[in-house]
Amino acid sequence: MDRRLLVLAAGMFAVGTDSFVVAGILPQVAASLGVSIPLAGQMVTLYALSYALLSPTVAALAGHWPRRKLLLTGLVIFVIGNAITALAPSIGWVLASRVIAGLGAAMYSPTATATGASLVAPERRAAALAIVIAGLSSATALGAPLGTLIAGVGDWRATMWFVSAVGTIAAIAVWFSLPPIPALPSATLRQRLAPLADARITLTLLTTLLAYAGAFSVYTYVGVVFDRVTHGSSSMLAGLLLVWGLAATIGNLVAGKLTDRFGSRRIIHAALVIMALNFALTPWSSAHAVTSVLAIVVWGLCGWGLLVPQQHRLITLAPAAAPLLMGLNSAALYVGVSSAGVLGAAGLGWFDPHRLGLMAGALVALAFGMALLADRHIAAKAIVGAPAVA
């Protein structure tokens, strides 16, 4: 295995840990700073929103930078942002620091993905991308639960120091292990957004956005959605997040094989339908330990299993624009995540927290509708010779 890809994956692990660990410490953050849980939940919103908005902008403005310089700068900003979070005296400082950390992630993640793909021969590109992205999915299995456990032993600030430490280790690894890499061809922001003119691509990106807006509206407030099982125990919540992360990693790997065998369309449909039904049942499944674990497993399998066929579909539609489309898909995912914090907060104000899954299920159902519309446009284009997706 190429060591350079593992180094890039280490940075993705840091970024992923920061993305997913906050949900498990929201009650502590809210209590410590004397604010409501919905307000504390905007930590997730601002981190994800800054990533989504700044990712294409940074890529356009810093496209001429050497890759290692851009990767290191992103990780340094990421570490500084998380250190400020750990030291923040008020919710205002906390929220501002999440924007800084999001900027660092926006500089690092798309660059790492594109760099990983450029380091290998075209026939090995998918495998290289899988290794780099594995850092992100493994963060759900290891980083987030470990961070939650640290918060249980110490406090939420210790968790943010942990994230900063992981980012520092990743930066050191990039500095010493990654050789200088020439800058990739730069692209303007308009060029990056050009594929959005294709309805097939736009609808596929909307599928990603809506699906993860639904999934993360529950994840952001997972501590209160499953509190009838965890009873406020950080260790029990960490256990649930560990199960979710392991299921996510398995779902990601299995979805790759299934997509190669059956095509992206069937896997996208199956993942969305199962996920929507699973969320719709959480008002009842989250009341008992066994059904909660089952719901968490299904959620992890389908939620992360959706990413692979979505990426496969986009690359098949426009192979020459693959790096740009991966960046746009990541942006769509993070817009969904940032929207989830707001939608989840609104949901907590409207109805019982244990019914938040009903709203999540509705959003995933809308994502399924977008996927069906994408299918129609793909089939129509195939008739006149454009690439089709099975």
Where do the protein language model's features map onto the residues?
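Helix-loop-helix hairpin linking two adjacent transmembrane segments in secondary transporters
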Residues: I91-W93, P122-F176
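Structural signature of the two symmetry-related core transmembrane helices
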Residues: L70-A83, R266-A280, G361
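Helix-to-loop junctions at the C-terminal end of transmembrane segments
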Residues: S55-P66, G251-G263, L348
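Cytoplasmic helix-loop-helix junction between adjacent transmembrane helices
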Residues: S97-L136
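Paired small-residue
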Residues: G81, G92-I100, V290-V298
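C-terminal transmembrane helical hairpin of 12-TM major facilitator-type secondary transporters
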Residues: R265-Q310
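Helix-breaking motifs and short loop linkers at transmembrane-helix boundaries and internal kinks
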Residues: G34, P66, L87-W93, H231, ...
